């Protein structure tokens, strides 16, 4: 009996311990879930810790967020606020996990500990709480603490209440100094960044947009390049965060920055010459002619030496090309560091308004950069964009003085040595309209895009969409597109210029006035009755409908 009683005591004690273990396990499991839910909210008292392992939640590991059908209408209304899926963004944790999208060779690189410190400057205007704070947390969570001096948030006159005191209260509790600087009035990206740079303290200034997410290992390779050469300005690979689902998609290390005829920034394939320079090692930085402008790091002192931003430019637009030209022409280097990845929400439209209108502001800014940096090539730009010549672009004497002081190289040097594959044709037979003798109509790109048909329309003599270049390589170019025909009697389409002749090779006879498509041995003809706005090729007949006048456009009157 005594032995039986002893066994019952042992059994009961064991059962109690098992139940206690189960209780503790369930308790802490639920607590973890509570913490995870809290991280998705807005309470200013929460300080989020670095992500140690992937969470199970919307958008984790960069996966897309799917909105239930019953919430689609509300989602569409919320989308209008910031021109991205605000509902999806608010479902995602402020410190969500992201995949490591670096090249394998980047993951094993070792960087010195004594890299310079950086201040991260982020300008915002009426930004969503979730995207702004997710940017901040990604910087904190994925940056070595001793390299991150501070984060400077510059408020460009936001009107939303949660971006006032609630934001200040929230960032005070973060484990890295975060300063909120307020612009007294709407000043635009350029002047707001100058304000942030002026108050920052790091040896390097890193500019980010307000809807970014930094990935693991993003900072060290940027700072390492600047430590190697303080005159090197570096950009990360810009990954895409979907504005619809907030899916994180890795950007390509095989593209770099350029620009088209209208001085719009464009991404183009990295040319073979740059691959050869790097001996095929894709983990080495890419020398890029221009940068997108939203995300880059620059040595603080060098930023001052080369003239920071052009403070005479307004709001936004053109400043990225201006600083790109200036860096290269004045002795610096501009790189995309392929081992650094930062995501950016790319929107299809802007939610912001611009005083004076977007077109007027960009025309002014582009006029300033053309007058200061493009030398004789500004004439080409003015022919393509005649509206630019009619804007008041202000006083540029200080910027011209800066160029003289820094002994900067001419723009022709930039095109020959840094951007030889530029879309600006340096050697051409004609630049202007291509007019049909019979109809008196002109070829017109109709503002159409790649893979669309070229048009024909009444000649207006104002340049713009009716400016074509007949190049020394016998291409007919409109911006970065070439006229291309792939079949007999086919329509003429606009494809990316490949410089391989083939379907893009045209022979102009200045006596017969014909444009012969060499591959097909047919001639460019007027539009047909079936499609009155699309020219095609036909068997060469010598008819007036196959005769074309190539006329150079005269420079518009400049104010």
Curated annotation (Swiss-Prot):
Residues 29-559 are lumenal. There are two conserved domains in the glycosyltransferase region: the N-terminal domain (domain A, also called GT1 motif), which is probably involved in manganese coordination and substrate binding and the C-terminal domain (domain B, also called Gal/GalNAc-T motif), which is probably involved in catalytic reaction and UDP-Gal binding. The ricin B-type lectin domain directs the glycopeptide specificity. It is required in the glycopeptide specificity of enzyme activity but not for activity with naked peptide substrates, suggesting that it triggers the catalytic domain to act on GalNAc-glycopeptide substrates. Substrate binds at residues 156, 186, 316, 347, 352. It comes from the Eukaryota. Residues 1-8 are cytoplasmic. Its EC number is 2.4.1.41. One of its GO terms (molecular function) is manganese ion binding. This is Polypeptide N-acetylgalactosaminyltransferase 1. It catalyses: L-seryl-[protein] + UDP-N-acetyl-alpha-D-galactosamine = a 3-O-[N-acetyl-alpha-D-galactosaminyl]-L-seryl-[protein] + UDP + H(+); L-threonyl-[protein] + UDP-N-acetyl-alpha-D-galactosamine = a 3-O-[N-acetyl-alpha-D-galactosaminyl]-L-threonyl-[protein] + UDP + H(+). Residues 285-347 are annotated as: Catalytic subdomain B. It comes from Sus scrofa. GO terms for cellular component: extracellular region; Golgi apparatus; Golgi cisterna membrane. Pfam families: Glycos_transf_2, Ricin_B_lectin. Catalyzes the initial reaction in O-linked oligosaccharide biosynthesis, the transfer of an N-acetyl-D-galactosamine residue to a serine or threonine residue on the protein receptor. Has a broad spectrum of substrates such as apomucin-, MUC5AC-, MUC1- and MUC2-derived peptides. InterPro entries: GalNAc-T (IPR045885), Glyco_trans_2-like (IPR001173), Nucleotide-diphossugar_trans (IPR029044), Ricin_B-like_lectins (IPR035992), Ricin_B_lectin (IPR000772). The keyword Plastid does not apply. PANTHER family: N-ACETYLGALACTOSAMINYLTRANSFERASE (PTHR11675), POLYPEPTIDE N-ACETYLGALACTOSAMINYLTRANSFERASE 1 (PTHR11675:SF123).
């Amino acid at each position: 009996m005594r032995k039986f009683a002893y066994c019952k005591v042992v059994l009961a004690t064991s059962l109690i311990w098992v139940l206690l273990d189960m209780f503790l396990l369930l308790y802490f499991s639920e607590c973890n879930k509570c913490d995870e839910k809290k991280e998705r909210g807005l309470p200013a008292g929460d300080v989020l810790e670095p992500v140690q392992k992937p969470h199970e939640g919307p958008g984790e590991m960069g996966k897309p967020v799917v909105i239930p059908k019953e919430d689609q209408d509300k989602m569409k209304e919320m989308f209008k606020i910031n021109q991205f899926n605000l509902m999806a963004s608010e479902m995602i944790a402020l410190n969500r996990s992201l995949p490591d999208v670096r090249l394998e060779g980047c993951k094993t690189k070792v960087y010195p500990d004594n890299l310079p410190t950086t201040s991260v400057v982020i300008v915002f205007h009426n930004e969503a709480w979730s995207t702004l704070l997710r940017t901040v947390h990604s910087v904190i969570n994925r940056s070595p603490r001793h390299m991150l001096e501070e984060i400077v948030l510059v408020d460009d006159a936001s009107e939303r209440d949660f971006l006032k005191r609630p934001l200040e209260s929230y960032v005070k509790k973060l484990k890295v100094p975060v300063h909120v600087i307020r612009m007294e009035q709407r000043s635009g990206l350029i002047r707001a960044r100058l304000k942030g740079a002026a108050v920052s303290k790091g040896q390097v200034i890193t500019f980010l947009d307000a809807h970014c997410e930094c990935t693991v290992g993003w900072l060290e390779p940027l700072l390492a390049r600047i430590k190697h050469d303080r005159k090197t300005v570096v950009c990360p690979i810009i990954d895409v965060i979907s504005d619809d689902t907030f899916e994180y998609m890795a950007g390509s290390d095989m593209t770099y920055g350029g620009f088209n005829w209208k001085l719009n920034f464009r991404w183009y394939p990295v040319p073979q010459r740059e691959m050869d320079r790097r001996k095929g090692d894709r983990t080495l930085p890419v020398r890029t002619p221009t940068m997108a402008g939203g995300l880059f790091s620059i040595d603080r002192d060098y930023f001052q030496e080369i003239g920071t931003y052009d403070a005479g430019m307004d709001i936004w637009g053109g400043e990225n090309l201006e600083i790109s030209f200036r860096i290269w022409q004045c002795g610096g280097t501009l790189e995309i560091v392929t081992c650094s990845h930062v995501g950016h929400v790319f929107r299809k439209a802007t939610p912001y308004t611009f005083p004076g209108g977007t077109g007027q502001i960009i025309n002014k800014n582009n006029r300033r950069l053309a007058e200061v940096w493009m030398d004789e090539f500004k004439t080409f730009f003015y022919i393509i964009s005649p509206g630019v010549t009619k804007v008041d672009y202000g006083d540029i004497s200080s910027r011209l003085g800066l160029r003289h002081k820094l002994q900067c190289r001419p723009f022709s040097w930039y095109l020959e040595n840094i951007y030889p594959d530029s879309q600006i044709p340096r050697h051409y037979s004609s630049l202007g309209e291509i007019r049909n003798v019979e109809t008196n109509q002109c070829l017109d790109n109709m503002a159409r895009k790649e893979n669309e048909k070229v048009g024909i329309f009444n000649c207006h003599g104002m340049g713009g969409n009716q400016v074509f270049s007949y190049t020394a390589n016998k291409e007919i170019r409109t911006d970065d597109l070439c006229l291309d025909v792939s079949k007999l009697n086919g329509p003429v389409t606009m494809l990316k210029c490949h410089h391989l002749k083939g379907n893009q090779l045209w022979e102009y006879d200045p006596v017969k006035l014909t444009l012969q498509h060499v591959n097909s041995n047919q001639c460019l003809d007027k539009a047909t009755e079936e499609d009155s706005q699309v020219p095609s090729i036909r068997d060469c007949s010598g008819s007036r409908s196959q005769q074309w006048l190539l006329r150079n456009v005269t420079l518009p009157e400049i104010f």
